[in-house]
Amino acid sequence: MPERLAEMLLDLWTPLIILWITLPPCIYMAPMNQSQVLMSGSPLELNSLGEEQRILNRSKRGWVWNQMFVLEEFSGPEPILVGRLHTDLDPGSKKIKYILSGDGAGTIFQINDVTGDIHAIKRLDREEKAEYTLTAQAVDWETSKPLEPPSEFIIKVQDINDNAPEFLNGPYHATVPEMSILGTSVTNVTATDADDPVYGNSAKLVYSILEGQPYFSIEPETAIIKTALPNMDREAKEEYLVVIQAKDMGGHSGGLSGTTTLTVTLTDVNDNPPKFAQSLYHFSVPEDVVLGTAIGRVKANDQDIGENAQSSYDIIDGDGTALFEITSDAQAQDGIIRLRKPLDFETKKSYTLKVEAANVHIDPRFSGRGPFKDTATVKIVVEDADEPPVFSSPTYLLEVHENAALNSVIGQVTARDPDITSSPIRFSIDRHTDLERQFNINADDGKITLATPLDRELSVWHNITIIATEIRNHSQISRVPVAIKVLDVNDNAPEFASEYEAFLCENGKPGQVIQTVSAMDKDDPKNGHYFLYSLLPEMVNNPNFTIKKNEDNSLSILAKHNGFNRQKQEVYLLPIIISDSGNPPLSSTSTLTIRVCGCSNDGVVQSCNVEAYVLPIGLSMGALIAILACIILLLVIVVLFVTLRRHKNEPLIIKDDEDVRENIIRYDDEGGGEEDTEAFDIATLQNPDGINGFLPRKDIKPDLQFMPRQGLAPVPNGVDVDEFINVRLHEADNDPTAPPYDSIQIYGYEGRGSVAGSLSSLESTTSDSDQNFDYLSDWGPRFKRLGELYSVGESDKET
């Protein structure tokens, strides 16, 4: 505390001492109009100077002062004297009044209007306001007239060390790569001090580390934090806490200080190689496992993190490199061993692999710590499994002639059980692929035989599936596709490729080609088709036509002469024999129809029918047939119409002569007949003068008795029917005795109290005695017919 007090006193008196030292030059160099000097609140009267100096410095009027200073945070028992105002016009007779105005006048600073002394009446804070500008003026005490123009002066607040440094952005976080060299910059921090940075050392800061050595250091003036130790290892310690101090007064004793924290995190670098947890791995896998199945996982641990710990796995050696593969799982950072090709326990029972794990991202700065890879041995044991039969071939292709005999052997399939037990195999045909059951197979030896005749012309290929099943385990089955090709034999005779009809002009020339025909054969010989054409033996010397074989395997028919007459013979039939080149050859006879037609001079056919001579000009046989068909259709329509007109439907209701109508209403009469007594009378509707305004209900007895209502006023003749109906509608709507039509009507008591009972009550009967309807005859003539229909007669009783 004594040291602290001495420093504060030193800060207080330092400016006063400096001002005192510089005082004589200021006095001698003062202008001629100055009569008094004010220094730091302590005025120096000119009366204390020599007589000569007083004579030189006298003036009629004027202010003399420098800047005034006042210490901040001063809290004495009395107001602190800041300075004194004085003018050379003041002889000391107390006839001059001093007035102070400006910043803080009257509130912070107070002036003695007689002596001119200025006092600070409040505690000042330089950090809030560093200086105040005020105006001083001397006026006559009695008249208040200004004696001199006002003058401005400044009161500056002197700083003291009353604010500690602050880290406004703390606490801090920073990162630095592990294994960094000595002196690597980590970050920098900044503290601020609210004291005056110009005056004294109150705002001069010095930084230091309170906690965090020996790992980090700090520049005292720049606050740059650096590494103090090289090669710090993240795997040993990842995070460090550093406490930083900022102290003012240049770090000297008695200065104020502030602290903050810095958390330094070491970031990872790839400085550690991967390492397998074990040098030997054992896995087992069934021989029937599906391709691509994961057999096992191997993992190489890496102390690094992130991408620095990523490793790729490879199979670099072993006797199963072709059967197995390994893939890297970036998520789990391990290697997955999968099956690439099928396994066979009977062939090889175990495999040995050498697996390598290598870092993907290698930092060349740490290559000397390598190699960044590791190897391990993987032992895979194949387990025996009950496998399905294996065919000797993945597919089979068989050929058979279409004329093969039934039950003849087409081919054979073979299969075996690959297991050591070697179970017997049973063969069968998947009938979904042989719906017509054209083939059979021997269940023991797999020989395929023909069950039904084949026809290559219907189907050339037959694709069936053969099933092989183990006898000891029926769940073990295998399938193989078998394609059977039907080979052709010459079993179809050739024939015309289409229905040919030749036309011959009456004015044709000898040797003219009448028609060119071609043949087709459903068979498919290996060397292609070759047809032979000839006429029947009895038609070889045909006087009218001859044939000629063409190079394209077609046939041309030629006329031997001209002068054909269609009136003598309209149609000629020419039988032609067509033979193929099969072994043995087959042949057929096709007949060509040749019509004689009338042609124009240029050979265009115009008419080929004899009827053309007897038909009307311009009307062909087709047109006559169409006309006749239309006439027949019209006759059918007329007959149908007449038949429908003559047809009469029997009436739905049979009228009985003995029908006694009495009160029965016949609704087949429009309007209800004579029983429709409630119909509106149009005359009454047109003249409703005498109608009573209220018509009581006759079907029910009202619960309450109402007084007779006043009748409606007479309306003039010719009133509109619509108005009358609206009045009646209003009466019906307001009738309290009328039940609502939307209410539930109960018919459960219908017919009760009647001797005959309800007609609508139907019930099941258990015997013929229950069906006695004799009482219907007692109901009167209306039910006589009904009683005859349902009464039990004597004949019925006898039966």
Curated annotation (Swiss-Prot):
Question: Could you tell me which residue ranges the Cadherin domain spans?
Answer: 62-167, 168-276, 277-391, 392-494, 495-616
Signal peptide boundaries? 1-29
Identify the glycosylated residues.
N33, N57, N188, N463, N473, N544
For this protein, the record's SMART domains field holds:
CA (SM00112)
Question: Which organism does this record belong to?
Answer: Homo sapiens (Human)
* Domain statement: Three calcium ions are usually bound at the interface of each cadherin domain and rigidify the connections, imparting a strong curvature to the full-length ectodomain.
Membrane topology is: Single-pass type I membrane protein
Kindly indicate whether the keyword Cell cycle belongs to this entry: no
Q: Where in the cell is it found?
A: Cell membrane
**Propeptide residue ranges?**
30-61
> In which tissues or organs does this protein occur?
Mainly expressed in brain. Found in certain nerve cell lines, such as retinoblasts, glioma cells and neuroblasts.
Q: Which residues lie on this side of the membrane: Cytoplasmic?
A: 643-799
Q: Where on the chain is Phosphoserine found, per UniProt?
A: S795
For this record, an example GO cellular component is: adherens junction
Q: What is the lineage of its organism?
A: Eukaryota, Metazoa, Chordata, Craniata, Vertebrata
Listed SUPFAM superfamilies: Cadherin-like (SSF49313)
- Keyword set includes Metal-binding: yes
Q: What role is this protein assigned?
A: Cadherins are calcium-dependent cell adhesion proteins. They preferentially interact with themselves in a homophilic manner in connecting cells; cadherins may thus contribute to the sorting of heterogeneous cell types.
- Give an example GO biological process: synaptic transmission, glutamatergic
Q: Which residues cross the membrane?
A: 622-642
Residue ranges, Extracellular compartment?
A: 62-621
The record, for Pfam families, names: CADH_Y-type_LIR, Cadherin
Q: What is this protein called?
A: Cadherin-8
Keyword set for this entry? Calcium, Cell adhesion, Cell membrane, Cleavage on pair of basic residues, Glycoprotein, Membrane, Metal-binding, Phosphoprotein, Repeat, Signal, Transmembrane, Transmembrane helix
Q: What is its main location?
A: membrane
Single GO MF annotation: beta-catenin binding
